[in-house]
Amino acid sequence: MNIKSLLLGSAAALVAASGAQAADAIVAPEPEAVEYVRVCDAYGAGYFYIPGTETCLRISGYVRYDVKGGDDVYTGSDRKGWDKGARFALMFNTNSETELGTLGTYTQLRFNYTSNNSRHDGQYGDFSDDRDVADGSVSTGTDLQFAYITLGGFKVGIDESEFHTFTGYLGDIINDDVISAGSYRTGKIAYTFTGGNGFSAVIALEQGGEDVDNDYTIDGYMPHVVGGLKYAGGWGSIAGVVAYDSVIEEWATKVRGDVNITDRFSVWLQGAYSSAATPNQNYGQWGGDWAVWGGAKFIATEKATFNLQAAHDDWGKTAVTANVAYQLVPGFTITPEVSYTKFGGE
């Protein structure tokens, strides 16, 4: 009701103003020139200039749908049916040139829907209460997954930890973190130096993140700290990072190497060590002191890519996953994947 009153009041004021000037000569304003949207190709495909500015904008996104069956590779429990999930991600990139370098922003919104198998608790369907039961669930959520600003080599905002991003993520598979290599999303202030000879270095002050069961954000003013070095060439790359968890006052490190055997076949290997032999920390979230991951990618055709990853940690957990990412048509990829987990002590 308040909004409607404001709109009516504004309309009345405009009519009164027009009536007061009725005796004046009416001069029609010159029509403004039409400004068409211009393509901006300086930062890649899909960018256009925001009208009236020299800032380039790209709007993109994806839709993903997962169907999972068999045992839960993270816990070992039997799903007793299908678990399904859907995600819509909406992404915005902006870039413009300044006297201090390229000023950029990146934002990603995620809309998630998850439906787990109900496993019949006796309240739905013709089953008795003595069945091996576990209630299913349906959940929805919206996350601001990324929101950061870049200027030159600086990055400020919500991103994923440099403990992951600087060395590179794990394999191109869905269940890549059965043996976790650290928490992901965090607030951070980071600077990356990039040399002209393939050498780069990073230093980051991070807030820490949280998962379903644990909160790894900092306690007080002292941030978590990450530093790393990398060398990359046509043959591949080698990178290492060291991270300090300011809450438990322990550190963790990772070293990773990638080798391009051919233009279609590549392999990678990563080893990690933590001074605290517990996964309840921000960085060294594998079991025990150490963990190792490795994988391979083979581009079989223009449409089909094979991916393989294996991992093992100090507590005896082993995880192996393989998939085939098949591009049915441009923009639509189907990825069948199979995973195996052997838990420590089995």
Swiss-Prot record:
Pfam families: Porin_2
GO MF annotation terms: porin activity
GO cellular component: cell outer membrane; pore complex
Topology in the lipid bilayer: Multi-pass membrane protein
Signal peptide span: 1-22
Record remark: domains: Consists of 16-stranded beta-barrel sheets, with large surface-exposed loops, that form a transmembrane pore at the center of each barrel. The pore is partially ocluded by a peptide loop that folds into the pore lumen.
UniProt similarity note: Belongs to the alphaproteobacteria porin family.
Assembly notes: Monomer.
Further remark: The pore formed by Omp2a is larger than the one formed by Omp2b. Omp2b pores have optimal permeability to allow growth and protection against harmful compounds. The larger pore formed by Omp2a may be advantageous for intracellular growth, when the bacterium is competing with the host cell for nutrients whose concentration is particularly low within the phagosome.
Entry function: Forms passive diffusion pores that allow small molecular weight hydrophilic materials across the outer membrane.
Protein name: Porin Omp2a
Species for this entry: Brucella ovis
Encoding gene per record: omp2a
